[in-house]
Amino acid sequence: RGNHDNPAYFDGTTFKHKRMRCVPDYTVLQVCNHNILCVGGAISIDRKIRMEAWNKKKVKYGFDSNLSDGIPRAYYWSDESLVYDEKKMDAIRSAYSIDIVITHTAPSCCELQTKSGLTRWAVDDPALLMDVQTERFTMDQLLQRLQADKHPITHWYYGHFHQSWHVVMDGILYRMLDIMEFCMVY
């Protein structure tokens, strides 16, 4: 679940097809002898502009963002960011041995490290820098919990930053995937 994806779609049933499924956060997929933890969400650095554009569209076309199917439409969702869920991590600890993690954003040890583009957006969004810092802290919590619970993590995949990068740290291959970049997991 990326930051520009409607969280309502990720309930495990709204989009469930033979080869593609939108799963809820903290879902563990058991595929090809791997236990894959999926945790989505991230901060949109352009959230202020997205909210303003959606409000203009609603006024111009005279519609509400909640249509008859009950799925909200918008350019920004206030619940887009990731949430650390202690209870779900407790359940995962007792039921699985996680070896692959897929998230939208990444722990603070990973790229992107620079905030050069971020400061430009923060001029009109004073809470942005703190929210992004909190987001990285939340990802660090997730990583630390997985390590404390002795999960044998070998791979961590993420996107969000629209670039490609990888590194091995502490036995984990962290791989940032660019838009439309795919990779094989063995």
Where are the regions that the model predicts?
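Conserved hydrophobic/aromatic beta-strand scaffold that supports enzyme active sites
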Residues: 28, 38, 102, 182-183
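Adenosine-cofactor binding site in Rossmann-like domains, unifying the SAM/SAH pocket
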Residues: 27, 77-81, 178-180
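Short, glycine/charged-enriched secondary-structure capping and boundary segments
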Residues: 13-16, 51-53, 115-118, 170-173
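Short catalytic/ligand-binding loop motif for oxyanion handling, primarily in non-cytosolic enzymes
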Residues: 7-10, 29-32, 44-48, 108-113, ...
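Binuclear metal-dependent phosphoesterase catalytic core
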Residues: 30-32, 140-149, 161-186
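Active-site-proximal loop/helix segment associated with metal-binding centers of metalloenzymes
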Residues: 34-137
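Active-site neighborhood of phospho(di)ester-bond hydrolases with catalytic His/Asp-centered motifs
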Residues: 1-4, 23-24, 39, 100-104, ...
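Core catalytic region of metal-dependent phosphoesterases/phosphodiesterases
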Residues: 1-32, 120-123, 127-138, 148-149, ...
